[in-house]
Amino acid sequence: MANLPDKDKLLRNFSRCGNWEEKYLYIIELGGQLPPLSAEMRTPDNRIAGCQSQVWIVLSTQADGSVQLYGDSDAAIVKGLIAMVFILYQGLTLAEIVAYDVRPFFDALALTQHLTPSRSQGLEAMVRGIRAQVAARQ
């Protein structure tokens, strides 16, 4: 996985941003830390429906049972939101992802109140898409 901060560090870094312009820049910076997604992974099966931007998320299960996520978007802020979702799920197993409710974390960041409705819907679509991929593997 990319060199992304853990959940606690993400919260700390986010709270250090002085205003929402800085927070958006931080979100974009997080997206820039995601490794490039290969053309082979940009398939219709990996495309997340319900996002205005093009979003691809690929899930692979590691030998230890944890999940590795790969993703990309054609929009910088959306790519940053992908990175934020990946931070929440990194190192979790399939069962842990299904059980984990990400909404309180996003509420703690006040994220959904500051995203456009289409980006908020896209964020929900990403979470649903990951959960659907997890359900297909269980």
Swiss-Prot record:
The keyword Ribonucleoprotein does not apply. Belongs to the SufE family. GO terms for biological process: iron-sulfur cluster assembly; sulfur compound metabolic process. GO terms for cellular component: cytoplasm. Homodimer. Interacts with SufS. It comes from the Bacteria. Participates in cysteine desulfuration mediated by SufS. Cysteine desulfuration mobilizes sulfur from L-cysteine to yield L-alanine and constitutes an essential step in sulfur metabolism for biosynthesis of a variety of sulfur-containing biomolecules. Functions as a sulfur acceptor for SufS, by mediating the direct transfer of the sulfur atom from the S-sulfanylcysteine of SufS, an intermediate product of cysteine desulfuration process. The keyword Cytoplasm applies. The gene is sufE. It holds the Pfam family SufE. This is Cysteine desulfuration protein SufE. It is found in: Cytoplasm. Keywords: Cytoplasm. The active site is at C51. Pathway: Cofactor biosynthesis; iron-sulfur cluster biosynthesis. HAMAP family: SufE (MF_01832).
